[in-house]
Amino acid sequence: GFDFHFLFTYQKPTYKKYETSVTFSSGYVGKINATGNIVAEIPEVLIELDPSYMITPALKVWTSFRYFSKTYANINQAYYFNGHWETFGGVNWQANKRLSLGCTVVNFLNQTGAKGSIAGAELITKDEAKDIKNQLMTGSYLRPFTVEFTASLKF
């Protein structure tokens, strides 16, 4: 039969009394005052839509759609990522009591972009970020379109 899982999360965790500074050997002083800022890497809205259908008692098809709203990439809120969808889908087949097979398609909508945090951006302020253009940055990215096959054998 048909099954549908839905989850809506609204959250707004903020930093409390988060002030510090660090002086580097070059003399540069990096200051952070993140008090009241939304916690980095946490979306304010998270939505999960997970329909599945058992075609037969041994064959299941499923999809998963997850929405993440705007997410800050550093604690100073100088960088952020726009909201995005992450998608998965697949087929699971219980061939017999010992063997199960599966196929999962990751990112079937072929979404592209970054997520999470940006390496080395912890101390960058909004004012400093305005002057940073055309520079290579590293971080985490959405998983690319991928097809995965699985097999599980139970003894």
Regions picked out by a protein language model, each given a short descriptive name:
Residues 41-47, 83-87, 143-147:
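Residues that define the transmembrane beta-barrel architecture of outer-membrane proteins
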Residues 7, 88-92:
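Transmembrane beta-barrel strand/turn architecture of Gram-negative outer membrane proteins
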Residues 16-18, 61, 73-75, 99-101, ...:
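Short acidic, gly/pro-rich beta-turn/loop elements at beta-sheet edges
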Residues 28-37, 73-78, 88, 134-139:
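Extracellular loop and loop/strand-boundary signature of outer-membrane beta-barrel proteins
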Residues 20-29, 69, 78-83, 117-127:
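Flexible, surface-exposed loop regions and adjacent strand-edge segments
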